[in-house]
Amino acid sequence: MRKLSRRQKENRAKTKDSIYSNLEDAITILQETATAKFTETVELHANLNIDPKYADQQLRTTVTLPHGIGKTINIAVLTNDSNFTEAREAGADRVGSDDLIEEISQGNISFDLLIATPDMMPKLAKLGRVLGPKGLMPSPKSGTVSTTLTATLSEFKKGKFEYKADKAGVVHVSFGKSNFTHSQLMENLTALYKSIEQNRPSGVKGKYFKSLFICTTMGPSIQLDLNIFL
C-alpha cells in the first residue's frame, strides 16, 4: 500500500468519521483539503438504489450547471456538407462527413463530444464499438443527435454535459474546480443533486439515494447527510 503523505494524513483527519448535514460546512472542508499544487477537479459520487441491468432502473441524462465545470471541450459535428457552414459558425471544433467517420474508424479521436444529425446515424452505427466504450456515441436521449445544430452547439458550449450511473449504480461526476468560489460550488452541487433526483428511474422502489460523497482530485472523501439538500 502506498504511504500517505503528511498532507494527505492531515486532510483525512479533518473528515474522518464525519457526515456533514450542512452544505456550507461541507464545501468549506472540501476547499480546505484541496491542497495540491494544481487546480483540482471537484466531484460528486452518488450511490443510488438502482440496478442498471434493468431498463427501468438506468440513469443517463444531461445537465447544465449554473457555473459550468471549468472545462473547455472540443466538439465534433458529423453531418452532410450542406450543414458544414452552420456548424462551423456555431462553434464546432471539427466538422465532417464520411471523412470524419474514416478518422474515427482509424482511432483518430480528437474531440470530447460528438454531435450528429439523424441522417448520419446509419453510417455511424458501425463505429459503436469504437465510440461506445468512450461514451462518445451520439444518442437522442443525450441531446447529441440533433437537427438544430446552432442551438445544440450553443447549449454544449455553455457547459451542458451528459452523466450516467455506472454498472454498480453509482454516478461519478464533476461539478467544478477547486478554485471556484464557495457559492459557485454550492450552487453547482445543488443543481446536480436536483438533476439526479428529478431523473429518478421509474423502476426505483423505496429510497433512491444510498450515499453521497464529494471530493477533490487529491483530497479525502467527504460524506454528506442524505437530507442535506432538503
UniProtKB/Swiss-Prot annotation:
What is any one GO biological process for this UniProt entry? translation
PROSITE patterns with a match to the protein in the record:
RIBOSOMAL_L1
Q: Which CDD domains match?
A: Ribosomal_L1
Q: What Gene3D superfamilies does the entry give?
A: 3.30.190.20, 3.40.50.790
Q: Which UniProt keywords apply?
A: Chloroplast, Plastid, Ribonucleoprotein, Ribosomal protein, RNA-binding, rRNA-binding
| Major place of residence | plastid
* Protein's job: Binds directly to 23S rRNA. Might be involved in E site tRNA release (Potential).
What is the name of the protein in this document?
A: Large ribosomal subunit protein uL1c
The organism encoding this protein is: Trieres chinensis
Taxonomy, top ranks, is: Eukaryota, Sar, Stramenopiles, Ochrophyta, Bacillariophyta
